[in-house]
């Protein structure tokens, strides 16, 4: 099982960091820090964010 990263999930959803920031109400800088490894979100936050990005990706693919 390959673990999906927040960045992978964001790209799969077709979102920029700025758009993800708007949709999920997470500061853009925080998203950037997570993606570069400068900061690591708590595991539960990472799971919730990835789950939401997967939902957005499914919505976008069904249009």
Regions found by a protein language model. Give the residues of each.
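Short basic helix-loop element that most often maps to the first helix and adjoining turn
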Residues: 5-19, 48
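Key DNA-contacting residues within the recognition helix of helix-turn-helix
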Residues: 7, 32-33, 42, 50
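Generic low-complexity, intrinsically disordered sequence content enriched
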Residues: 8, 19, 27-28, 52, ...
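Short alpha-helical DNA-recognition segment
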Residues: 14-33
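Short, conserved catalytic or interaction motifs in soluble domains
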Residues: 36
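DNA major-groove recognition helix of helix-turn-helix/homeodomain DNA-binding modules
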Residues: 42-63
């Amino acid at each position: 099982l390959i673990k999906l990263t927040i960045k992978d999930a964001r790209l799969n959803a077709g979102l920029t960091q700025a758009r993800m920031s708007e949709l999920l109400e997470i500061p853009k800088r925080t998203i950037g820090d997570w993606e570069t490894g400068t900061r690591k979100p708590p595991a539960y936050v990472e799971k919730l964010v990835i789950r939401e990005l997967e939902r957005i990706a499914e919505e976008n693919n069904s249009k």
